[in-house]
């Protein structure tokens, strides 16, 4: 029997969302994504501790920030040995509201990869989908540095990223689901509110339809999944980045997976283009309580994990 994972791959590029690169080979993903939380999780495992220790030892006299950048590249280069496509490496979330420093960090990461023998076409620079992050992506894209826009929770963020020419966006399914489920509390009914009605699934479907309708070339990669049903409801999306745990569940399942998203259907949709300038972007984002709260929370969480990683490095020096 064909597995659900193999069926999904007929419609969608499957990406592994992990820093635990030893798990990659069995699922044969095209690309891989990382973030500060995933790297922090990985270096706490015995299998990856030597990478952290070697990076700290090799750059003993350098700043913690310098060492973290080298650690990210160390993980990225190991991941690229196991996949045919691209790896996403994230800019420090504490730069989410600083356009110039985000640009500088993106350039620096690419230089480090190139010094390690990795071409820039195999790397995506992850930036938060703030106004400042989107402006940084606009500059980097013009320089041939491809960007993956993360912490994306709304159509206005997606529209702004497309207008800026970002290579790829990562709308977060699970975190949207979490917010609406918490809001409903005891009234949440998974049978009624999940599946095709899942707010996170609907958000990605809306963004995908908007992009294909207006002919944007920016890739849509659904991210942050809680269940396999969220994944299969988005079969046909350009890419889906999936944790090893959910990849395993899809691998173990033989449930039928049908295409749910189609560019042809999207082109026939009746839609209006979203107006994008700084003031309208900020107002529309502010008007969306879920997107505002989850964006702020995501930046805080990634920043906190960056601090934890810094403390781990300090303890080894």
Swiss-Prot record:
Subcellular localization, as worded in the UniProt entry: Cytoplasm
Pfam families listed in its UniProt record: TAL_FSA
Annotated catalytic residues: 126 (schiff-base intermediate with substrate)
Enzyme Commission code: 2.2.1.2
Record key words, sorted: Cytoplasm, Pentose shunt, Schiff base, Transferase
Top EC class of this enzyme: transferase
PROSITE patterns for this protein: TRANSALDOLASE_1 (PS01054), TRANSALDOLASE_2 (PS00958)
Nucleotidyltransferase keyword on record: no
One cellular component term from this protein's GO annotations in UniProt: cytoplasm
Molecular function as annotated in GO: transaldolase activity
Catalysed conversion reaction: D-sedoheptulose 7-phosphate + D-glyceraldehyde 3-phosphate = D-erythrose 4-phosphate + beta-D-fructose 6-phosphate
Lineage: superkingdom: Bacteria
Pathway: Carbohydrate degradation; pentose phosphate pathway; D-glyceraldehyde 3-phosphate and beta-D-fructose 6-phosphate from D-ribose 5-phosphate and D-xylulose 5-phosphate (non-oxidative stage): step 2/3
GO biological process, one term: carbohydrate metabolic process
Subunit structure: Homodimer.
Family the UniProt entry places it in: Belongs to the transaldolase family. Type 1 subfamily.
Record function comment: Transaldolase is important for the balance of metabolites in the pentose-phosphate pathway.
Protein's UniProt name: Transaldolase
Organism: Burkholderia mallei (strain ATCC 23344)
């Amino acid at each position: 029997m064909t597995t659900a994972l193999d069926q999904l791959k007929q419609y969608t590029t499957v990406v592994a969302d992990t820093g635990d690169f030893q798990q990659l080979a069995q699922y044969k993903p095209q690309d891989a994504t990382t973030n500060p939380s995933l790297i922090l999780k990985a270096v706490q495992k015995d299998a990856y501790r030597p990478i952290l220790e070697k990076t700290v030892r090799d750059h003993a006299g350098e700043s913690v920030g310098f060492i973290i950048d080298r650690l990210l590249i160390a993980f990225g280069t190991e991941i690229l040995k196991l996949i045919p496509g691209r790896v996403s490496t994230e800019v420090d979330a504490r730069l989410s509201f600083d356009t110039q420093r985000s640009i500088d960090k993106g350039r620096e990461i690419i230089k480090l990869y190139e010094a390690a023998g990795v071409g820039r076409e195999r790397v995506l620079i992850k930036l938060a989908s703030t106004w400042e992050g989107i402006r940084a992506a606009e500059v980097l894209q013009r320089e041939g540095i491809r960007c993956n826009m993360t912490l994306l929770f709304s159509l206005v963020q997606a529209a702004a990223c497309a207008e800026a020419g970002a290579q790829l966006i990562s709308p977060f399914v699970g975190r949207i689901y979490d917010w609406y489920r918490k809001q409903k509390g005891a009234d949440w009914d998974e049978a009624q509110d999940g599946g095709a009605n899942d707010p996170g699934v609907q958000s990605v479907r809306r963004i995908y339809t908007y992009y294909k309708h207006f002919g944007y070339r920016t890739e849509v990669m659904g991210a942050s999944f809680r269940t396999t049903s969220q994944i299969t409801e988005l079969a046909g999306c350009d890419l889906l980045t999936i944790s090893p745990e959910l990849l395993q569940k899809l691998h173990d399942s033989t449930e039928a997976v049908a295409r749910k998203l189609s560019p042809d259907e999207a082109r026939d949709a009746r839609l209006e283009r979203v107006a994008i300038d700084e003031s309208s972007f900020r107002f529309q984002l502010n008007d969306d309580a879920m997107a505002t709260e989850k964006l702020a929370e995501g930046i805080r969480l990634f920043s906190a994990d960056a601090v934890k990683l810094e403390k781990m490095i300090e303890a080894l020096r």
